[in-house]
């Protein structure tokens, strides 16, 4: 059975990393920046989770940071917030966050675009997009996600990591429902 690919963005703690890996998501991303602790956190996550591909989320075109991310973190994917920083990237999956643009940006071949979905926007425009190269991001509800999936959307879905209620604790009831709807 083919199901929608799932990318969980902005993972900040091991509670989320372990939960989403156990739930069988396809991708998780975390921000890498000039702060050395972001790389230490990356390596901790990489050691703790299995079976999920990791993408580095870079919010700059700083070539030194990109090089450090590729060499030190060795991600399987890279999420860019601008389109200019991807030239010369090694063989990895490239994602482009187009949530702040109109989506009409020229992207490198085989890259994936991340777009904002809103239920008031014409759903048919999303159904016409290539499901292999499109992920939709929103503040999902089970009804909103169900409507999109029932209409025939086959592309990827983005969720975001969240804050812990207390160290090592978080309520995943709503996320359980969303993931169950996606994987059923």
Model-based region annotation:
Residues 97-126:
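Internal catalytic-core helix/loop-beta-alpha segment
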Residues 90-98:
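Phosphate-end processing signature that detects enzymes handling 5′-triphosphorylated RNA
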Residues 1-85, 120-157, 161-184:
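Conserved N-terminal beta1-alpha1 strand-loop-helix module at the mouth
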Residues 95, 113-114, 135, 158:
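Ordered hydrophobic segments in well-structured contexts
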Residues 77, 93, 111-112, 133:
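Structural motif
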């Amino acid at each position: 059975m083919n199901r929608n690919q799932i990318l969980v963005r902005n993972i900040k703690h091991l509670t989320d990393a372990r939960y989403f890996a156990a739930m069988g998501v396809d991708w998780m991303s975390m921000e890498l920046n000039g702060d050395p602790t972001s790389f230490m956190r990356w390596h901790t996550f990489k050691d703790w989770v299995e079976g999920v591909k990791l993408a580095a989320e870079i919010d700059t075109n700083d070539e030194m940071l990109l090089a450090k991310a590729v060499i030190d973190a060795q991600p399987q994917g890279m999420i860019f917030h601008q389109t200019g920083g991807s030239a010369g990237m090694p063989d990895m999956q490239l994602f482009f966050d187009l949530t702040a643009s109109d989506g009409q940006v020229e992207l490198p071949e085989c890259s994936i675009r991340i777009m904002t979905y809103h239920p008031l926007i014409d759903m048919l425009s999303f159904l016409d997009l290539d499901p292999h190269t499109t992920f939709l991001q929103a503040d999902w509800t089970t009804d909103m996600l169900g409507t999109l999936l029932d209409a025939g959307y086959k592309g990827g879905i983005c969720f975001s990591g969240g804050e812990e209620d207390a160290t090592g604790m978080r309520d995943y009831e709503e996320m359980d429902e969303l993931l169950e709807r996606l994987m059923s």
